[in-house]
C-alpha cells in the first residue's frame, strides 16, 4: 500500500434489496471527516486499481464509516464491492474530501431542503445523525430546519427510511418524506406517491 491509501476492514454488511446494500468499515483512529464529505474506495480489477468516491453515511461521532451502495452490473467498481463481506478489506484513501457540508454555526436561520433518490440520501443521513447528537447535547439549537425528500422507484429501496422517520418524531427541526414512483409493486406501501 502507498502513503495515500490503506486497507479498511469491513465490519458489517446489510442488504436492503438485491442490488442495494450498506457496509461499515473500520477506518482506524486517524481518519477524520465532516458530515457531508466523501471517502474514496477502491479495489483491484484486471491488474489496476479502480476507485470511486462515495458519500459517508455515518456521523463523524461514530467510530466506523458507513457507505450505501447500488449495484451497477456493468460498473467498474460496484460489482467488486458487492462481493465483499465482513472480514474482507477494501482499499480506501486516507483523506476525506468534499465541500457538501452543512453550516449550523451562523447566526441567521437558514433552512435546508435535502432532495435525493435512493443512495443519494447518504450525506443527508450523516447530517441528521450528527445534528441529532449535537441537539441532544445542546450544541445545535434546531433553529435551522431540515426537510428531506427521498424518492425511489420501489418502496424497498429506502435503506434509511425507518431511522430518519424515528429521528423526525423526536425533534422539532427535521421532517422527511419518502416517495415511491412504483407503489403498486408493494401492497403494504402507505407513503407518498
Regions found by a protein language model. Name each.
Residues 96-107:
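A short, basic/flexible loop-to-alpha-helix module at the beginning of a structural domain
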Residues 2-88, 181-182:
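Ferredoxin-reductase
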Residues 135-143, 167-171:
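Short, conserved loop/helix-junction motifs that constitute active-site signature segments
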Residues 66, 91, 113, 147-149, ...:
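A structural signal for isolated positions on well-ordered beta-strands in alpha/beta enzyme cores
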Residues 44, 95-96:
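Short, surface-exposed secondary-structure boundary micro-motifs
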Residues 123-139:
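Histidine-anchored nucleotide/phosphate-binding helix
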Residues 117-123:
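Ser/Thr-glycine-rich phosphate-binding loops at phosphate-binding pockets of nucleotides
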Residues 2-7, 147-193:
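Reductase modules of NAD(P)H-dependent flavoproteins
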Amino acid at each position: 500500500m502507498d502513503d495515500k491509501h490503506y486497507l479498511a476492514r469491513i465490519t458489517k454488511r446489510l442488504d436492503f434489496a438485491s442490488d442495494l446494500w450498506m457496509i461499515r468499515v473500520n477506518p482506524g483512529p486517524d481518519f477524520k471527516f465532516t458530515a457531508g464529505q466523501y471517502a474514496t474506495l477502491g479495489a483491484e480489477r484486471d491488474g489496476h486499481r479502480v476507485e470511486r468516491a462515495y458519500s459517508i453515511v455515518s456521523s463523524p461521532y461514530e467510530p466506523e464509516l458507513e457507505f450505501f451502495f447500488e449495484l451497477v452490473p456493468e460498473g467498474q467498481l460496484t460489482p467488486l464491492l458487492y462481493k465483499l463481506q465482513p472480514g474482507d478489506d477494501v482499499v480506501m484513501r486516507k483523506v476525506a474530501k468534499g465541500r457538501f457540508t452543512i453550516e449550523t454555526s451562523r447566526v441567521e436561520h437558514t433552512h435546508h431542503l435535502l432532495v435525493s433518490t435512493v443512495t443519494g440520501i447518504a450525506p443527508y443521513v450523516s447530517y441528521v445523525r450528527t445534528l441529532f447528537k449535537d441537539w441532544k447535547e445542546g450544541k445545535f439549537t434546531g433553529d435551522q430546519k431540515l426537510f428531506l425528500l427521498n424518492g425511489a422507484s420501489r418502496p424497498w429501496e429506502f435503506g434509511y427510511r425507518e431511522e430518519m422517520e424515528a429521528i423526525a418524531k423526536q425533534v422539532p427541526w427535521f421532517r422527511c418524506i419518502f416517495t415511491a414512483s412504483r407503489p403498486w409493486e408493494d401492497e403494504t406501501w402507505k407513503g407518498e406517491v
